[in-house]
Amino acid sequence: MGTFFRVCLALLACWLGYGPARAETRVALVIGNGAYANKAVLPNPTNDAEDVAAALRRSNFEVILGTNLGQSQMQEVAIRFARAAAKADVAMFYYSGHAMQHNGVNYLMPVDARLDDEADLKRFTRVDDIVSDLQQAKNLRILVLDSCRDNPLAEDLKRSGRTRSGSVGRGLSKMEAPLGTIISFSTQAGRT
């Protein structure tokens, strides 16, 4: 597990008062996508997700863990998470894998992703939708994106000529955190 994760988990443990003393309801969705069908495999996301899930369980989170999820599986766990977040005091979302921005909107990539044109983005998970799901938690909402942002599918889309010039940007777009929400990126917005 990299330094970024260790720092995030240490801060999270301090913030939440590590251990069983608190009676808060805590839920987390942890996704690690690395076994991409159409591009090179990323070796770390699955291990990172499992490490984060274990640390969150030690902090009394109910964890929904998904690794190497396709489109339908990502939708299923996101719906399950939204329902759990609505009943939680604290909700956290952690993602490791490919992500990209298009027209200022951030997307998470399922392992069965194809990106032949802009219409295919409907099959990706919008980060804004996850943030909306997080907002249902009563007290604290945490979004951690440790994504590989040098997205090879975005390059395919640019080369295909089936997108407007400049609509696929570097890295992820900057996000404003709603009140009571912590958003953490592994790099600055717009960087890979």
Stretch-by-stretch model annotation:
Residues M1-T3:
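N-terminal secretory signal peptides that target proteins for export/translocation
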Residues R6-G17:
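Bacterial N-terminal signal peptides
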Residues E24-R26, F61, K138-L140, L179-T181:
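Short glycine-/polar-rich loops that comprise or flank the Walker A/P-loop
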